[in-house]
Amino acid sequence: MLKTLPFFLKALKDLLLRNMNIPIPFSHLQITGTEFNYFFICHRKLWLFAHDIQMEQESDNVYLGNLIHEHSYPREKKEIMIDGVIRIDFLDDGAVHEVKKSDKMEESHIWQVLYYIYCLRQKGVDIRNGVINYPKQKRTTDVELTPEKETEIINTLIKIREVEAAPHPPAVLGSKICKKCGYEDFCYS
C-alpha cells in the first residue's frame, strides 16, 4: 500500500489546491481513529503504530482507559464499527461520543471525534456534533465539525500519510508525555 501513497497524496493535495468541495471517500482513507489521535500526540508514535510496532497493549494507562471505557455508560450501545476501521464508543442524541480516561491530551481527543464525525458525514450521516466524556473527571467537552475544521481534517489526513510513508521514524519527542507512553521503552532504550 505504501507504494501507492505518493500518487494518493498528490491527488489529495491537488484537490485542496484547486479548492474543490469534493468529499474524499472514507473507504479510500483507511485511517483509524487511533492514527488520527496519535498524529496530534507524537508523530513517532504514529509511525511506529502504522508499521505494526504496537506496544500500547502492555501499558497500564491503556489498560485503565479500557476499564473506564467498558464500565462507563452501561446503557449505551458500545463500539460502533464503521468499515472495520473506525470504532465509535457510542452515539447518543445525534452526537458521537468518545470516552477518555483524562483530558490531558484533549486536543488529540477533539480531533479524533471531529474525524469520526467527518467519516460519518462522508457516509451520508447527517451529524455535526460530538461529545468527549471524561467519566473519571465527571465532565464532558462538546465538539462541532465546522467547514474550517473539515478542511483541517483533510490536510491532516495528507500529513498522516506522509508521516507513515517516511522510511524512518521521526525523532524522539523528548517531552514529559513520553514518561506515560507505551512506547517509552522502545524510544529510550
Predicted feature locations:
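Charged, glycine-rich intrinsically disordered N-terminal tails and low-complexity linkers that flank
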Residues: 1-81
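Short amphipathic alpha-helical segments and their helix-coil junctions
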Residues: 21-29, 92-100, 159-168
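Structural motif
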Residues: 31-38, 108, 169-176
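Generic detection of long, well-ordered alpha-helical segments
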Residues: 33, 110, 146-150
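Conserved catalytic cores of phosphodiester-cleaving nucleases, focusing on short active-site segments
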Residues: 42, 88-103, 116-118
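Active-site metal-binding core of divalent-cation-utilizing nuclease and nuclease-like domains
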Residues: 58-93, 104-111, 138-145
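Metal-dependent nuclease catalytic regions and adjoining charged, substrate-binding loops involved
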Residues: 70-83, 122-189
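Short, charged, amphipathic alpha-helix that recurs within catalytic cores of restriction-modification
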Residues: 109-121
